[in-house]
């Protein structure tokens, strides 16, 4: 039986549902979403943890199924679902950057260079690149970003990581978030601007979105 991690769920985590979970989700789904849900269940692909709905219960987790862009219109559909924690078979962090390299197409060499320079940083990816790596379906286009997740534990690691991301952003369409302890996520580009020109930043958490000053977030990191 799945046991929820002590640290709780975090946005962009991956969640696999048991058969009963898919059955419950299908029972509440809109008709146009049912084929995608059936495909996800049949392939045993994970759903992605998203911010909790305001009326979600404590024993639920809110999830998303980002579908591939429409071949003709390019429209992106994200199927929003909820699952009971008891219907989860397993959960995992977002996709490791190294694991996504094989699915990165024209970015592969440049992403491999980022992965080498970011050794020890534990970079992960979400969004189009992650979904393409997980499913084998076509998500990445010439307009896609590379959404990275960076979980620093110390101020030095944060500074080093920001230097690496800023340098490689000249060669890659890098986007994504710094995730401070407790799942407090900030756009790494917004953080860079706020450090250069002091300002509050938007912090995204599992249950809320708020403004915070950079000092309060830095205080959650180790000094070394």
Specify the residue positions occupied by each region the protein language model found.
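Helical scaffold of the NTase/Pol beta-like nucleotidyltransferase catalytic core
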Residues: 1-128, 161, 166-172, 176
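Mature, function-bearing regions of proteins
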Residues: 78-86, 191, 196-219
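Active-site nucleotide-donor binding segment shared across nucleotidyl transfer reactions
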Residues: 112-146, 150-154
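Conserved catalytic core of two-metal-ion nucleotidyltransferases
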Residues: 168-203
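Extended catalytic-interface subdomain
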Residues: 221-224
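Conserved beta-strand segments of the P-loop GTPase G domain that flank and frequently precede/overlap
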Residues: 64, 151-152, 179
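Short, glycine/charged-enriched secondary-structure capping and boundary segments
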Residues: 138-141, 164, 191
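Short acidic, Gly/Pro-enriched loop/turn segments at secondary-structure junctions
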Residues: 155-159
């Amino acid at each position: 039986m799945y046991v929820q991690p002590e640290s709780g769920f975090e946005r962009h985590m991956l969640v696999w549902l048991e058969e009963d979970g898919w059955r419950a989700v299908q029972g509440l789904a809109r008709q146009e979403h049912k084929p995608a849900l059936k495909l996800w269940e049949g392939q045993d692909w994970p759903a992605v943890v998203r911010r909790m709905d305001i009326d979600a219960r404590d024993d639920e987790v809110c999830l998303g199924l980002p579908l591939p862009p429409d071949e003709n219109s390019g429209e992106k559909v994200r199927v929003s679902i909820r699952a009971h924690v008891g219907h989860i078979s397993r959960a995992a962090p977002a996709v490791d950057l190294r694991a996504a390299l094989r699915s990165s197409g024209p970015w592969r060499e440049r992403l491999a260079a980022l992965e080498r320079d970011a050794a020890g940083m534990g970079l992960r990816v979400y969004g189009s690149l992650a979904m393409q790596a997980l499913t084998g379906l076509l998500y990445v286009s010439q307009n896609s970003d590379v959404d990275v997740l960076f979980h620093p534990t110390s101020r030095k690691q944060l500074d080093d990581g920001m230097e690496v991301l800023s340098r490689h952003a000249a060669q890659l369409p890098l986007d994504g978030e710094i995730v401070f302890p407790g799942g407090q996520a900030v756009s790494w580009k917004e953080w860079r601007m706020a450090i250069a020109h002091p300002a509050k930043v938007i912090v995204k958490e599992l249950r809320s979105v708020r403004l915070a000053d950079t000092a309060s977030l830095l205080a959650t990191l180790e000094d070394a």
